[in-house]
Curated annotation (Swiss-Prot):
Originating organism: Drosophila grimshawi (Hawaiian fruit fly)
SMART domains, per database record: WD40
Keyword Ligase: no
Protein name as it appears in the record: WD repeat-containing protein on Y chromosome
Alphabetically ordered keywords of this record: Repeat, WD repeat
Keyword Repeat: yes
WD repeat copies, ranges: 157-201, 331-370, 374-413, 464-503, 516-555, 603-643, 748-787, 831-870
Biased composition (Polar residues): 1094-1106, 1161-1171
Domain of life: Eukaryota
């Protein structure tokens, strides 16, 4: 497109819109920059100022500014100067004053400020805390980290730039270490870095003059410096133990001693040569609250609290720094509770009971360099992240505040600990893991908080936004990429360096109940000259931005609480459409910007989902119900209407007032049910025949695209319509045109195209799907007359797109379209894990960019090579707007998240490497060699044995036994060249099994019948009572009984209590067998299973009943219960039967008067089968 604007009074000065395009027809021989910042000097700037002041009205036009720059020896080509003039002219009046000129220079220098790159997209503490139980009996009183790598690093080993990313190695135990928690009962618990319990131990007190309150340990990883163990006690003394870490120093294991105890007096006398002690007696007059030893500075830091203000009068040495014999006192009111030393920054951060956080220079103790105020309680923990320039402080009320170390400003206040920890818990311990960037909070719970964690580059390349990316645009004037997200952020990126130039937060907001809520940005576009940005939000608001300085130029709105789904900015007009089902037109003419907007006729019956425009010809809009309407751009009148379910049907453009009323009423009803739910469309106009419009037309339109180079004829397909079924329909926007063709654009069930784009000449169609796939279609000869079709050079396409090269097998993306001749699919690969919401193309460098629901915006070459993710922490690829990307034939890497789920097609396209069939042929050669070796080995065996053995090898007089359950390992003799296997087979002779006699006890039990011992029960049912009236049977003695069963054993010698209906015993105590007082195992022999069964039977009979039913009472007249057992010895053994069941409360266990024991023993039934 080409539009001409009159720049000034000079009629020869014309500015064409096409000149701002990166694909201008001018052939650029070399890269030219229109930046003045690198070429202008102070003297030249002063001369330009004088020229501006001498100009009429202190304003200059297009040609005047060029002459002024040439007067100060600054020259540009016509193409470069036109771009420069449009960048400076922010008011779009083609007249520049001194303020505009200086503002352009100021904003350019601000873009080069490194501090602008440090602003984070998310808060330092954005992840929810992890909470788990401590597994201690009481609250944790101490917490520390058992680590292998030290936090202190020699200065010569510290890198100049600390990387804000990691490769995942910090999760290893060697790097992360183990957490150790202790409680007041003396219990220690060891935890992994991810708070998984490992083991527990018990601590003991040491023999020191005073109890130790705090400790610190300093060491280097290289082991070249003596390690320091610092102890601070309750009396204000500090003791230092120094030793060499070579061969573990004093911690060497000694044979026979699992624990080595040391007495401090022996350490002072030098009886332990490996330890070098040093004492600082009465360093403070109060207890030592915190200690630290810096190996780099060879300095000891010790702090104490001085809460007695009357005694110290505010001049207390809260922190003392001891270096050799020199002492420096940091005098702070009320003393210091905690401090942190950042050696790389040479700063010291202190916190105390006075609620202030002070930042000191380590070498200046007279006054702090900054005082951070904002806490309402005493400071109990502080730590610093030097690589992020952040200071974290925690107060007594469990509120965490994050501060900027350079600007000394508050970044975040995190108060989730107040909700998680009960208010009665005040003694909370904190420890910061500097390697993992975790803050561990310990009380009665363990809480792990991520503090500005590093980016795991082995899992992701980073994020572009803090929420899904909704719109990605390329500005051809400033040559940058603008991304808008659902986090209400607008970010300007330099795609050639990967740097973030400008970030605008909280762009669309709304106040609800006094709280400011961010509104998601859902649509955006540029003005015709691409100097301003128009954004639309989910609440119906519209804003025009001068995004180079983050200034809102104008505010607009469609109907309230109606999402804006598409915005179009043409000359002098702005079109916005969305859930209000109509097109709203705003004026963009100077002097008429703030008039009432114009509402186009409401012909749609459902929410508008997408729209596109072709300058000078028309606008197309599509709805959620599948309606498509073509409008005249000049008049705003519709001229064609289609439905995607039946695109050949003619639909009359008729607006009924009754339909509009019913539609408005349904809209109000649906708004009450929630803004996220789609409205019900009323098709019939009669109230008694209201039907759901979505039931008849379930297919919705996801995206529309106008091909700008296709002419407006009925034979040219100029509009592409994407449906949620995966198809793309092609229409002609001519008055007599209509539906032409359709093709299937996805290869997975349930997938659909969400966004489309094309290059400047409409040769390729770029699509992004809901499953994260990027597909490129060759549409040069698609839906055009036969006479205009051109020949396609397939070798050239195969060079550009590796997807077209032949594969060993037909991949899934190719199988779906094998019967679809046009359009030709030239590339298909997975670019994101989630849906692609926006896609665009930069023509001259042939770069494709995509914005996805996975918070990232990625750049690709046209062939599918991965260039990078905007916002990544990794080094950026070298790109230029004047050279084609991806022509250096280097190895391109894959996104880490895609690498784990990529198919063979995606791996081939992104990496640019196709494996040929040479590997298969080499493998066949190896297989032939293996077969040749097998044949040679078989021939050697044949030659050794002269002739092969005949089947059956073992003859007909032997039958192989069944396979044993137990695995029998065969040890072969491998000393000989060949092993006859059959000589090693184990053959066992068959023997007859000996039938063992059955013990009399078993036979007697088997012959018994329960009917001999139980009699029928006489009873009747009383309907007025709640139980069965059963008459007790009369007791009778059985002749010849060996013993009498007591009544408390639960048995009666007569009729037992039974159920009157079933005739079964009512007591659940015993089984069906008659209990016995003694038993004899006289026939027991080793290996007799039947004899062993008697003991098990007795065990089951005794254990299945009640505690009293199965155990006979010992009778002194008959002696004790005896059981003789023949186990090879003539003398019988006495076996005491113990009861295994537990006694009920309140009962007294029975005793066993065993002659072998000599005294009564408690009967706990114990029957063993170990005989």
């Amino acid at each position: 497109m080409s539009m001409v604007y009159l720049a000034s009074g000079d009629s020869n000065a014309n500015i064409e819109y096409q000149t701002i395009s990166s694909t201008a027809t001018q052939q650029l021989t070399q890269e030219q920059s229109e930046r003045l910042h690198d070429r202008i000097t102070k003297a030249q700037l002063q001369k330009l100022y004088d020229l501006f002041k001498s100009s009429p009205d202190q304003m200059v036009g297009y040609s005047e500014l060029r002459h002024m720059l040439e007067d100060v020896d600054i020259t540009f080509t016509d193409y470069t100067y036109t771009r420069l003039f449009l960048k400076i002219n922010q008011n779009s009046d083609f007249m520049i004053d001194w303020n505009e000129f200086v503002s352009y220079l100021i904003f350019g220098f601000q873009e080069e400020d490194p501090s602008s790159q440090k602003e984070a997209l998310t808060m330092p503490i954005s992840a929810p805390p992890v909470v788990r139980k401590t597994e201690h009996r009481s609250a944790v009183c101490c917490i520390t980290l058992l680590k292998v790598k030290s936090d202190q690093t020699p200065m010569e080993e510290i890198p100049e730039l600390s990387a804000n990313y990691s490769f995942g190695g910090e999760d290893s135990p060697e790097n992360s270490g183990m957490w150790v928690t202790a409680s007041r009962e003396g219990q220690l618990r060891f935890w992994s870095a991810h708070m998984e319990p490992l083991r527990s131990a018990v601590s003991e007190s040491s023999n020191l003059p005073y109890a130790v309150y705090c400790m610190s340990y300093a060491f280097y990883n290289n082991g070249k410096t003596h390690s320091k163990l610092v102890l601070g006690d309750y009396a204000g003394n500090v003791r230092i133990l120094s030793y060499s870490p070579y061969l573990r120093g004093p911690f060497q294991a000694k044979p026979g001693a699992a624990l080595v105890e040391l007495v401090w007096a022996d350490v002072l006398k030098g009886r332990i040569p490996l330890l070098i002690p040093r004492e600082h007696i009465n360093l403070h007059s109060e207890l030592i609250s915190c200690v630290y030893y810096s190996l780099h500075m060879n300095t000891l830091f010790a702090s104490a609290e001085y809460r007695n203000t009357k005694k110290y009068r505010g001049r207390c040495p809260g922190l003392i720094m001891v270096s050799n014999d020199d002492r420096n006192n940091f005098r702070i009111p009320l003393g210091v509770s905690v401090f942190y030393v950042a050696e790389s920054k040479n700063i010291l951060v202190t916190g105390g009971p006075d609620t202030f956080v002070r930042i000191w220079d380590v070498y200046i103790s007279s006054e702090p360099s900054a005082i951070l105020t904002g806490h309402n309680g005493g400071i109990v923990a502080v730590f610093v992240q030097p690589e992020e320039n952040k200071v974290y402080s925690v107060d007594y009320h469990k509120v965490i505040k994050v501060w900027d170390l350079q600007e000394h400003t508050l970044l975040q206040t995190f108060g989730e600990l107040v909700r998680i920890i009960h208010h009665s818990e005040t003694d909370i311990k904190y420890y910061y893991h500097s390697h993992l960037r975790d803050l561990l909070v310990a009380g009665r719970k363990l809480i792990q908080i991520k503090c500005c964690p590093r980016v795991r580059v082995d899992l992701t390349d980073g994020n572009t936004h803090a929420a899904p990316v909704s719109v990605v645009l390329y500005n051809r004037l400033f040559r940058n990429i603008v991304t808008c997200g659902l986090d209400s952020y607008i970010i300007v990126w330099d795609p050639w360096t990967g740097r973030r130039k400008i970030i605008m937060k909280n762009c669309h907001t709304k106040m609800i109940y006094g709280e400011i809520i961010d509104i998601e940005i859902t649509a955006a576009c540029f003005d015709p000259l691409e100097q301003f940005l128009l954004t639309g939000a989910r609440d119906g608001s519209l804003k025009i931005w001068n995004y180079n300085n983050a200034v809102v130029v104008r505010n607009m709105s469609i109907q309230p609480d109606q999402e804006v789904t598409a915005v179009i900015w043409v000359i002098d007009r702005i079109l916005a459409m969305g859930w209000d089902r109509q097109v709203t037109e705003f004026n963009d003419v100077a002097g008429r910007e703030y008039g009432d907007p114009k509402k186009w006729a409401k012909f749609h019956t459902d929410d508008i989902t997408c729209a596109d425009v072709k300058l000078g010809e028309g606008v197309v809009t599509a709805t959620y119900s599948g309606e498509i309407i073509f409008w005249k751009l000049e008049t705003g009148q519709p001229y064609r209407r289609y439905n995607v379910m039946n695109p050949y049907q003619f639909i009359e453009l008729k607006l009924n007032t009754e339909e509009e009323k019913l539609t408005r009423r349904s809209k109000r009803i649906s708004s009450l049910m929630g803004a996220g739910r789609r409205t019900l469309v009323l098709q019939n106009f009669k109230p008694d025949e209201i039907k759901d419009y979505g039931a008849n037309i379930p297919v919705s339109v996801q995206a529309v695209l106008f091909l700008q180079k296709r002419p407006m004829t009925k034979d040219h397909g100029s509009v592409f319509i994407s449906l949620d079924t995966g198809y793309i329909q092609v229409y002609s926007h001519h008055q007599h045109g209509g539906f032409i063709k359709q093709f299937f654009a996805v290869h997975k069930v349930g997938d659909c195209v969400l966004t489309m784009a094309s290059d400047r000449k409409n040769r390729f169609l770029y699509t992004g799907t809901a499953f994260g796939y990027i597909k490129i279609w060759h549409i040069v000869n698609y839906c055009i007359p036969q006479a205009e079709k051109t020949e396609v050079c397939m070798p050239r396409l195969r060079l550009d797109f590796i997807f077209l090269r032949k594969d060993l097998f037909l991949t899934r993306a190719k199988r779906v379209i094998r019967n679809q001749p046009e359009p030709m699919l030239v590339s298909s690969y997975k670019g994101h894990l989630k849906a692609i919401n926006s896609i665009g193309f930069i023509n001259l460098p042939k770069i494709l960019f995509t914005g996805s629901h996975d918070y990232s915006c990625r750049l690709w070459t046209q062939g599918g090579r991965y260039l990078g993710t905007l916002g990544t922490v990794l080094p950026w690829s070298k790109l230029t707007p004047f050279e084609r990307a991806g022509e250096d034939n280097r190895a391109y890497r894959l996104p880490p998240d895609i690498k784990k789920v990529a198919s063979s097609t995606t791996l081939k396209v992104i990496s640019g490497i196709q494996h040929t069939g040479t590997v298969k042929r080499a493998k066949a050669v190896d297989e032939r060699e293996d077969e040749r070796d097998v044949e040679e080995a078989a021939s050697d065996v044949k030659n050794m044995f002269d002739r092969p053995l005949r089947e059956p090898i073992l003859g007909h007089h032997f039958q192989l036994p069944g396979r044993s359950v137990i695995e029998q390992r065969i040890d072969l003799d491998t000393t000989e060249l060949c092993i006859p296997v059959y000589t090693h087979l184990r053959v066992y002779p068959s023997e007859m099994m000996e039938h063992l006699p059955t013990p009399p006890v078993i036979g007697q039990v088997r012959a018994e019948n329960y009917l001999d011992h139980y009699m029928p029960v006489v009873g009747k049912v009383d309907p007025h009572d709640s139980a069965i009236n059963i008459r007790e049977p009369q007791k009778r003695a059985k002749a010849g009984s060996s013993s009498l069963l007591p009544a408390r054993a639960g048995y009666s010698l007569g009729k037992p209590k039974t159920n009157s209906v079933l005739g079964m015993p009512r007591s659940s105590g015993a089984g069906l067998c008659k209990p016995r007082t003694s038993f004899t195992l006289s026939d027991y022999t080793p290996g007799n299973p039947k004899a062993d069964f008697s003991s098990r039977n007795m065990k089951s009979n005794l254990s299945s009943g009640s505690p009293k039913a199965g155990i006979p009472k010992a009778d002194s007249s008959h002696g004790s219960a005896k059981a003789s057992c023949r186990l090879g010895s003539p003398k019988p053994d006495y076996i005491s039967i113990k009861k295994r069941a537990s006694f009920s409360p309140g009962t007294t266990p029975k005793t066993d008067f065993s002659p072998k024991a000599g005294k009564p023993k408690t009967n706990t039934m114990k029957s063993s089968n170990s005989h």
